[in-house]
C-alpha cells in the first residue's frame, strides 16, 4: 500500500499518454488542415479524368499542385470509407487548399460546371459554336458526332443528322465530356418533352415524327411570335395538301448554309434538296431545333385557310388567303420600308 505522500505511477502514465497523443495530433492536424504559402498562389484548375480510381485521383491532384500530402489524403479516404465517392471533373482552387479541403471538394463533387443555353431555332452549327464558346467541345468533333451514322442509329434519329432533335434548353455540363455524351443529353431531353400525347397527335395527323419536327423547325425559323406559329403551321399544311411548293425562305437559307439570314434570287433558283421553291413537299429534314411552341403548332395548326404570309419587318406577319391579297400586303410592306428609309 502506498502512503498519502507516495507518487502515483498511473497518473504519470495517463499524463504521459495524453501528452504523447497531443504531440502526435499536432503534426497530423498540420498535415490535414495546414495550407501552403499563399503569397504567389494563382488560381489552379485540375482535371480528374473520368473513371479514375483513387491512385489516379491522387496523382492528378498532386501533379496539379493542389495536394501537398498524398499519403495523408489516402489515409483520410480510407478512414472515411469514401474511395467510391471521389468524383471526376474539373476542380478550381482559388487559394492554397489543405488536404482536408481537397478531400472535401472531391468527395462532394464540387466541380466546375458549364451552362450552355440552346435557344429555340438554333441549328446544329449554332450549337457547335456555343459549345466552343463555352470551351466544352470542338465544333468539328460535335458536328462529326451529330452526323455520324452510328450515333444516329444508336440514338434512333431518322435522317442524316441530329438536326431538330437537340432540345432547346439550358444544359449544365461537366468536363471532361465527349461530344457524343452532349448529343445524347440533348436528344434525351427532346424525347422527354415530346410526350406520348404528342406522338398520338402526330399519328392521327398521318405524320411521322420526322415530318412533325421538320414542319416545326420551319415554323420556328419563320416566326418568333408564339401566337403566329399555328397560323404558319396552317399555311404549311394547306400548301402540302394542295401540292403547292412551300416557298419558305429559311429552308433555302439552310440549304445554302447562308446563316446570316439573307437569301438571293439566285439562291431561290438554285436546285437543292432544301429549296422549297423548286421542290414540292417538305425538305428532307429539319432546318433547326424547334421549341415546344413550334412543335405544338406543327401538331395543332390554326383553323385557317391562309396560303401566304409576308413580314411586316417588325417580327410579325400579314397572312393572306389569295395571291391578290398577298401581293397587296407585299406592296404595303415595301411602301412602308421605303418611307422608313427616307
Can you describe what each PLM-predicted range is?
Residues 3-43:
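N-terminal type II signal-anchor transmembrane helix
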Residues 33-194:
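Signal peptide-directed extracytoplasmic domains
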Amino acid at each position: 500500500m502506498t502512503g498519502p505522500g507516495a507518487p502515483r505511477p498511473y497518473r504519470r502514465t495517463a499524463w504521459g499518454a495524453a501528452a504523447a497523443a497531443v504531440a502526435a495530433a499536432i503534426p497530423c492536424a498540420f498535415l490535414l488542415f495546414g495550407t501552403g504559402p499563399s503569397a504567389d498562389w494563382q488560381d489552379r484548375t485540375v482535371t480528374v479524368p473520368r473513371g479514375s480510381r483513387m491512385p489516379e485521383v491522387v496523382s492528378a491532384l498532386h501533379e496539379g499542385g493542389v495536394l501537398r500530402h498524398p499519403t495523408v489524403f489516402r489515409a483520410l479516404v480510407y478512414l472515411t470509407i469514401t474511395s467510391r465517392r471521389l468524383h471526376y471533373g474539373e476542380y478550381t482552387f482559388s487559394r492554397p487548399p489543405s488536404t482536408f479541403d481537397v478531400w472535401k471538394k472531391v468527395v462532394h463533387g464540387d466541380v466546375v460546371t458549364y451552362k450552355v443555353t440552346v435557344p429555340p431555332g438554333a441549328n446544329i452549327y449554332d450549337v457547335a459554336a456555343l459549345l466552343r464558346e463555352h470551351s466544352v467541345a470542338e465544333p468539328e468533333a460535335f458536328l462529326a458526332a451529330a452526323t455520324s451514322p452510328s450515333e444516329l442509329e444508336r440514338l434512333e434519329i431518322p435522317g442524316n443528322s441530329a438536326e431538330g432533335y437537340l432540345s432547346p434548353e439550358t444544359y449544365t455540363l461537366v468536363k471532361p465530356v465527349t461530344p457524343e455524351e452532349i448529343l445524347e443529353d440533348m436528344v434525351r431531353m427532346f424525347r422527354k418533352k415530346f410526350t406520348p400525347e404528342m406522338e398520338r397527335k402526330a399519328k392521327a395527323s398521318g405524320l411521322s415524327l420526322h415530318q412533325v419536327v421538320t414542319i416545326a423547325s420551319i415554323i420556328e425559323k419563320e416566326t418568333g411570335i408564339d401566337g403566329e406559329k399555328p397560323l404558319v403551321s396552317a399555311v404549311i399544311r394547306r400548301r402540302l395538301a394542295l401540292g403547292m411548293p412551300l416557298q419558305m425562305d429559311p429552308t433555302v437559307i439552310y440549304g445554302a448554309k447562308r446563316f446570316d439570314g439573307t437569301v438571293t434570287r439566285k439562291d431561290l433558283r438554285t436546285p437543292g434538296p432544301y429549296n422549297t421553291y423548286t421542290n414540292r413537299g417538305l425538305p428532307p429534314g429539319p432546318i433547326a431545333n424547334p421549341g415546344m411552341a413550334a412543335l405544338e403548332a406543327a401538331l395543332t395548326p390554326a383553323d385557317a385557310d391562309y396560303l401566304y404570309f409576308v413580314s411586316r419587318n417588325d417580327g410579325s406577319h400579314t397572312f393572306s388567303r389569295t395571291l391578290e391579297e398577298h401581293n397587296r400586303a407585299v406592296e404595303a410592306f415595301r411602301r412602308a420600308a421605303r418611307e422608313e428609309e427616307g
